[in-house]
Structures are given as C-alpha cells and as structure tokens.
Amino acid sequence: YIALPFWLRPAVVNHQTQADTKMTIAAFIGLGVMGYPMAGHLASAGLEVRVWNRSPDKARNWAEQHKGTASASIAEAVRGADIVIVCVGADPDLRAVFEGPDGILANAPSGALLVDHTTASAGIAEHLSKQAAGYGQHFIDAPVSGGQQGAENGQLTIMCGGEPEAFAKARPILAHYAKALNLMGPAGSGQKTKMVNQIAIAGLIQGLSEALHFAEQADLDVRKVVDVISKGAAQSWQMENRSGTMIDGQFEHGFAVDWMRKDLGIVLDEARRNGARLPVAALVDQFYGDVQDMGGNRWDTSSLIQRLRKK
C-alpha cells in the first residue's frame, strides 16, 4: 500500500475518515465562535492541529479539549504546516496575522495552502493572494455561511476564490466542516459571492420583519399565519428558523447586528466600485443602524423587527 498525498485523495464532503488526513498538519488562526468548533472538526478527523488565538487562554482550552497544540505565536503555529486556516474579524485583522516578520506569509512553508474564512473585502483577498504567490504559497478566500450552529454541526456552506489546483488540495480538509463547498472563480470570488449572500439575507429579513409586524398589527394569530404561508412561495430559511424567535422577541440566536453592518459596509463599498445599484441593501444597512441605536448591537440579525415595533 502506497499512501497518496492528502490532496490526491478523494474529496467527498462530510464523508472523510481519520485515515484520509491523519498525516496532515493544519494551523488554525482565530478561535472565535466559528473558528473554535471548525478547528475541533479537523482534530476529530485525525489531523495534527496547531492553534493560535489572540487570547491565549482560549487556545489552551481548545488544545486541552481537542488534544491539539496551543502555539505561543503565529509563526510557531504555521511553520511546517500543510494548510493554514484563518478565521478572524475583518481586513485589518487579516493584515495583522498575515503580514510582517511574525506573520503567516513570512513563516508558512513554500507550497502551503492558506485558507481564509473571514468575511472581508475582495480587495484584501486579491492582495493576499498576490503576496502569497511571492512566497510560493497558495491563497484561497473562503468565507462561510451557516453561522455558529453550522460551524458546530460541520454543516457550513463555503464559497471559495483561488486557483483550481489549490482548491482541489484544500477541499478534502475543508470538507470536514462543510455541507457545500464550491470554487467560484479566482481570488476575491469567494468574498464577492458572500456579498451576494448577505444582500439576499438583508432583503429576506426585512421582508419577514414587515410581514410579521403587519400580522401583529392586523390582530392575526401570527404563528398560524406563518404556518400557512410557510407552505407556499413565501417560505425561506429565515422564516423556518427565525420567525418563532422574532414573534417572541428573542434575538440571541445567531449572527450579530454589529457583524452584519460590517458585512453590508463591505457590500456597499464593492457596489460603489462595480456600479451595482443596491437601494434596499443600503436602506437595510441604515435600519440596522437604528437597531444599534436601540442598544441591539449584539442582537441577532432578525432583530430588524424591533425597529418596527418601536412606538
């Protein structure tokens, strides 16, 4: 039996075994609500996982829980790694972890795969891809959709931008926490696809908020209304998963308003560059600003309905 390199092994989403990737060394940078469980899936799959987090205690806790390694620095984590996976906050955070003498680019080996799950601008993805190529590394922008629940359950949707060969190598690794995993085009294409996703979500949540608010004002049984219309053309993931909590005024079930505003800011910046007209997305961004003014910074995105209920 001759063991194939990990990138030549079959890649079937959510059907990997420990033997498929047991020799792969993965560095995971950023252990937030998404990164922590994602790194855990890699460890459970049998990869050698080294983690680094800005708060060292979280890295140590992760390493103890998952029998991995908590690295003292980014440089220590990425040296000799086959794949480096990043999940941080925004463009400035990406520059902080990738660039400089102690960053990923200067310390990851030539030939390494560099995968970024951060929702960021297409411009930073294109920039880091060019920088990585200068080091002989392969960068993939790979923002995700599915939220904390998707990360914990290994059921994320991942939208990738980069070289087909690099994507083929990364796919069997990323498959450990993905239900859908697609290459959308060259560097930056993953981020642009995530922008499309956020535009659609913004409109859906605003529409659902107005529908539920109207039903409330019309003295209808709102749950019965949802039960009926969810069986027709109005059905959506948001209706199925968020209508009940919206009716109950519970907004601790997902992606925070602060992060959605960050994402919509990226969307609107890109639209100014490419000439897309996004009147509804721009309005919803302002509406989320109203929610922030109400103290809802950490409420989930379905809290748009609260600004309609405000007397």
Locations of the language-model features?
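NAD(P)+-binding Rossmann beta1-loop-alpha1 motif at the extreme N-terminus of oxidoreductases
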Residues: 15-86, 117-118, 148
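Rossmann-like NAD(P)(H) cofactor-binding subdomain of soluble oxidoreductases
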Residues: 74-79, 83-84, 91-156
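Rossmann-fold dinucleotide-binding core
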Residues: 26, 119-199
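Active-site-proximal catalytic alpha-helix in oxidoreductases
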Residues: 154-161, 182, 186-218, 229-241, ...
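Interdomain hinge/lid region at the active-site interface
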Residues: 191, 235-301, 308
